[in-house]
């Protein structure tokens, strides 16, 4: 049972898979072992120790919660955990588990020490989540048999297992669920050097010719996200084969990405549309996310989960109690004059001396 939600709008730099065909590509490019996994050194080192300890004790790994922006490798890590433990992986997602029976069917079919991966775990229904609590703590579930006065509760024992939960919104998890994870890991955006290594590895798997400068050019425009880097690589490879000699150089990558409307800092049309709306329609902000969503014709969740994290991390956008505000860096990026000292926007910036 494998299902994932898809964004309504397909973007070349979207951090979610756009199709089942693309998901198949991603699976082919995924690292299979921890020593192949690039980046996230702290998380990787921790998992290496915890997995080895669990294997030596011949017991299930403690439950793992992975959170962070989309496209950073949460699903990949879940597969690696199962492979390193030498056990089976069952994969599903929060929205798919609508009834308690759906989860019970999955849990009762797990073998000893298997891994159950639930993507978008923050979207579990309360009924399903209640069933999960005793399963995580005691490896038992309570199910109701019969109806009305004849109904009775039956306790079923489960094999020891590891739950790996993934979410882009850790804050939406209930405290009881969050507290039941023994291992909690946040995945961070990647730097250009790490992404360049990922691009070169993926190019080798795709039999694409690429030089280090070409890989770095793609990496710099990938928004710190491996999934986007691999997607851009495939499009640049197409361009290199048709418009050049097949070798991806910095010049070829630059031309291909310009054609795809991905600028030197990794912005595409939607990023620019969002920032320009704040600058021109709302005078630099502050503006509420609902007004912003209406102004650019995009879903609120897409703005919060896909567009904003990178813009905030790179310093182009600020969240304030009064709404979203464009930063000094945004004005400079679009070649606009910065607000004067009397502007209310300047008073909302985190840095008083931002113009320095």
UniProtKB/Swiss-Prot annotation:
Where does this one sit in the cell? Cytoplasm
- GO CC annotation: cytoplasm; Holliday junction resolvase complex
Check the record and name the SMART domains matching this protein: AAA (SM00382)
User: Which residue ranges does the record annotate as region Head domain (RuvB-H)?
Assistant: 264-356
**Which EC numbers characterise this protein's activity in its record?**
3.6.4.-
DNA damage among keywords? yes
Q: What does this protein do?
A: The RuvA-RuvB-RuvC complex processes Holliday junction (HJ) DNA during genetic recombination and DNA repair, while the RuvA-RuvB complex plays an important role in the rescue of blocked DNA replication forks via replication fork reversal (RFR). RuvA specifically binds to HJ cruciform DNA, conferring on it an open structure. The RuvB hexamer acts as an ATP-dependent pump, pulling dsDNA into and through the RuvAB complex. RuvB forms 2 homohexamers on either side of HJ DNA bound by 1 or 2 RuvA tetramers; 4 subunits per hexamer contact DNA at a time.
Q: What is this protein called?
A: Holliday junction branch migration complex subunit RuvB
